[in-house]
Regions:
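Solvent-exposed, charged amphipathic helical/linker segments at domain boundaries
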Residues: 1-7
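A solvent-exposed beta-alpha-beta segment
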Residues: 7-102
């Protein structure tokens, strides 16, 4: 199933969503190691998440992916920055990417992309609740 060994993960975006993902303990319990947080904001670079994961510069992405043996990238940036981040992750050699940005990305055929759209998921739950409220199940 692909979860029989540890995999190194990198998170792009050290804002609130990225920091929350970096500090989520369930990743480590499931065999995923967050190797680094990456950001373009000089005010964030050099800081760490609450769990001690360093925020490194986006300009060092390729080197970090190579040195940390990163296999999976997580996009936790704004919608307007997401495509550039996706392209940079692919250029750095990643073939598996999880996208939290609320935008549909132009993808490469050799790359597996999974997107998490919180708005769509909330709309789905709201639709379900409306059915319950209307007497359907």
């Amino acid at each position: 199933m692909g979860i029989d060994r540890r995999r190194n993960v990198i998170i792009i975006g050290a804002g609130n969503p990225g920091m929350a993902l970096a500090d989520y303990r369930g990743f480590n319990d499931s065999g995923f190691r967050i190797a680094a947080l990456i950001d373009v904001d000089p005010a964030k670079i050099g800081r760490s998440s609450r769990s001690g994961i360093p925020v490194l510069s986006f300009s060092d992405l390729k080197r970090i992916v190579r040195e940390q043996h990163v296999e999976i990238g997580i996009i936790a940036v704004t919608a307007d920055a997401a495509q550039n981040v996706y392209d940079a992750l692919v250029e750095a050699g990643l073939n598996a990417i999880l996208n939290f940005a609320p935008v549909q990305l132009r993808t490469h055929s050799q790359v597996k992309l999974k997107s998490v759209d919180l708005r769509i998921n909330l709309e789905s739950l709201s639709f379900y609740l409306q059915g319950v409220e209307d007497g359907a199940s």
